[in-house]
Amino acid sequence: MAIFTLTSELHDEKAVASATWDFLKSLRQASTTEWMGEDPYLFMGNDYTEYGTHAIDIIYVRTGGTEGIFKGMLPELSKKSKRPFYLLTSGKSNSLAASMEILSFLRQQGIKGEIIHGKADFIARRIDTLAKVGKARRELNGTQLGIIGKPSDWLIASDVDREKVKETLGISLIDIPMQELLDVMATIPLREVDENPTEENIKKALPGANQIYDALKVIIERHHLQGFTIRCFDLLTAVHNTGCLALARLNAEGIVAGCEGDIPTMLTMKIAQSLVGVTGFQANPSAIDPETGELLFAHCTIPFNMVERYEYDTHFESGIGVGIRGYMKEGPVTIFKTSGDLSRHFIAQGNLVRNQALPGLCRTQQVIQLEDPAIANYFLNDPIGNHHVILPGHHAPLIQSFIEQP
């Protein structure tokens, strides 16, 4: 993250510089984010040549009397970046007053901005959040996500606005025929597996499940994909197997791998991965208690890097192939979903209170207690499709900041 400065010539530069280093030092000390030993703050001073090229660019309004200077710089800065202007203030030398005048001017021009002001720990947290959001948006820009086969027929409310996705996120959606995957599978021999499950039907299905994984790796490399969603139920009839094992592995390897050709959920998973480092558990709400806010989510696959342990079972609906029953660590979780046109978002925090393995449901089952029970009404009154993404940890403020920052 880069720190640029705005300073009036009327102020003594030596005194202002000393106060600047003390202020930035307090922010570094207050930051709780790990930046791999690097100084998170890149001090650029009054050289704005590289403005707009970092995960986040912050203008430190060091003194009053800078309003006119900023107004003169605005046309050039607006060419360099279309993101909001972030004005950092220290509370000294009329810094806050000048920032308020600048922000008011920006609002009059229809330009977004924010004043970052408060105690050192608050400022550090806000800057860390904005930096993570900026880093995520840079990572998403240029991403290619595949749609292998068409969305499943039952996903009647899961259309996507491809132009909006490209414009807003920088993500390109690539259509890949299911037959291409099947053709690749035909060239890949079955291989022995290390696992030795006791159930004979699962033991017989594992080589085929691994073949699906190997073929998907070929498709990913061929089309330069960072993720995909697959019309996985077609595999049941085409090869008498399932993609659950392959998706669990690929998600753990950092490749977004979604089920049922659900494009909005794939986008949700990719956004989540860019922000928190995991793709998430794509799942259906299977039961809801609107009075207590307790929800049951279930699906037949979950990323291996999200669970403490897992078991093999058959795929629930078909009773064939290899499904995954994963057990995630109990504790804080976030439920997230974005719509296909990116106009709506759902974010809720809760706690995973137990994993279960009841018959009659998809194999991985999670019971989640919402922090706010009233939010359960969203699922019954105004849901964004059926699939939602479960993330370990509480991330609502970070995700909300991503949504609010263009």
Language model regions located:
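Flexible, glycine/charged-enriched surface loops at secondary-structure junctions
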Residues: 36-38, 176, 231, 278-286
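Short, surface-exposed alpha-helical segments at coil->helix boundaries
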Residues: 17-21, 25, 96-103, 158-163
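Cofactor- and metal-binding active-site motifs of prokaryotic enzymes
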Residues: 30, 38-141, 151-154, 158, ...
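N-terminal basic/disordered segments at the start of proteins
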Residues: 1-44, 401
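Conserved, well-structured core segments that form the ligand-binding/active-site neighborhood
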Residues: 103-276
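Extended hydrophobic packing segments that form well-structured cores
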Residues: 323-406
